[in-house]
Structure formats: C-alpha cells, structure tokens
C-alpha cells in the first residue's frame, strides 16, 4: 500500500472510500504481512492553485531559461491549476520531453539533453515547493492533507508504472463542455485522434503512464472496437502495444443495477510480446438472449480454460497483426483467414460507379 499502489480521482469522496477499503484490506492481512500502512498514495485532485503571475517570480528568479522553457513552465502550471477538472489526463513529463532535440545524431544533442535534465530538475523542485506552499497555507489538517495530495499527484504524473489500470469516465465528444473540448484538442488530438470519447483519452494516458515493459488494464464501452471515429485509437493500440487478452462482454448489469456495454482488456508494452497471439473472449452474442445471465460464468470458464490450455468455444486466438488487414483496423477477430483476405480485394467502388436507382 505504501510502496506499490497509486491512484488518482477527481472525486474526493471516492478517494476517501478507496483509502478506507485499502486500510480494511491491510487489517485483514495484518496477521500475515506484519505492520499496518501509515498512509496511501491514493489522492484526490481536488486542490486549487493561484494564477501563474503570483508564482512566476519564484520560477524565473536567478534562472537563465529561454522563452520556450518559460512558456513550458507556464503551460504546466496552468495544467496543474486545472487538475481538479482534468485529473490524471494532465501531462507534465510529456511537455518537458517535447523540449528535447528530435535528432539524436545532432552534434549538440547530448549537451541539450544535459541542459534539459538540469532544467527539469530545477523546474520540478521549484514546482513542488510552490504547489506545497500554496495548497498547504494554514496549519489546519485539511490544508496540509491537500498539500501532500498535490505533491503526490505531481509525483504520479512523472512516474512510470509496471501496471496502469482504469475504469474511465464515458463522455462523448458532443457532450464535452468548452473547457474540456479545448483541453482534449490541445493534448489528445495530434498526431493521433483520441477525442471521440473521454475514455479514449484515458487509453492513451494509461499507456503513457505504463513503463516500457508495463501493462495496461482497461474497462469501458466497446464502441471503440468498430466505429470509424476511433480508428486512430485502434491504430495506436495495434502499433504500440500487444493485446494480451480482450473480453467483448457486451450489454449487461456487470456493475449491479447499472446497465453498461463494456469491453475489458490487458495490453502489454513489452516489444518482445508483439509476436505472441492475442486472445479474445466473445460474449456479446448472448446480449438480450435467455443466456445473458450466464455471461459472467462463461467468462470465468473461458479464462480458466485459457490458463489450463483447454478448448473453449468463446475463445479466439490470432496474431493481432491480422486485425490490420481490414481498412480502419476494426477489432474483427472471429472471421476466418480466407474471409479476411477478401477485404484486401478491390472494392465495388473501384470497379464501377455506384449510382442510386435502376
């Protein structure tokens, strides 16, 4: 709990409940594990920071930072000010990495990297001090807790994890408010588009937070599997990760009385796994049928059969490279290779002009 688990949420109450649950679990394991944890790294982003003009002097005083570096500091501070709205979608390390030279063969590249390391170290140190100062003003326990949360949050944004998991919010781009729309456009629109739904942004963010050999676990609506507007999301997954396991669960009351339409999956960033087959579990065919209530049972049986290397009619196995064989990369995993090859043939549109009418 103290050294391996980290978490971020906008909702302060959700964070408090999670902290309580972790302590209860720790109490249950105390007999086997020994000492109880004294704190957690599960934090809320419900803290506020002042306008940059009030802290600008602390950042640039005595520094020789150029205009680009100063703009980066300003941008990062403004993003942190919006943490209570955007949470872990804020990208600190990525903005700093953008200052590094693209061409590593450049004769000055190593010097630039050394200068950037010094800049990052100095900037982060000042940033931590300023965040702690402004969020921790006052001696009351709540202010001090918020100060610690803000520093932990900043550390989380700069850390690479072995595993990153999320059950992200589901908000269609048409329902983005003006602020969220601008934030997503600035951070998750180029070079690939992750702006179709808020959960798509979290797919990208979790992959960024996971280390080079890390894993990503997600659960969210399965709309991204086929729809054209999620093409870049699928392209990113197939290009940058390996699909270890993917469950197409479909509409169900997976979370009690709330009906959801989820897919859940595990991605691996380890390049050595990309040649391994991907495993898919298909359960959506039971949606709105008498067998719908058995989905959970079928899923658990399929997972067990995967572990024991037994046959299961719900499990499909294939190299994920085959998913690239159809235009826009839909996650169509259940068709035969022969049928898949037909998608590489000429389209009717390529041969004749299709017209309406007789």
Describe each model-derived feature in a short phrase.
Residues 1-154, 158-159:
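Class I S-adenosyl-L-methionine-dependent methyltransferase module
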Residues 10, 15, 19-40, 44, ...:
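Signature of N6-adenine DNA methyltransferases within the class I
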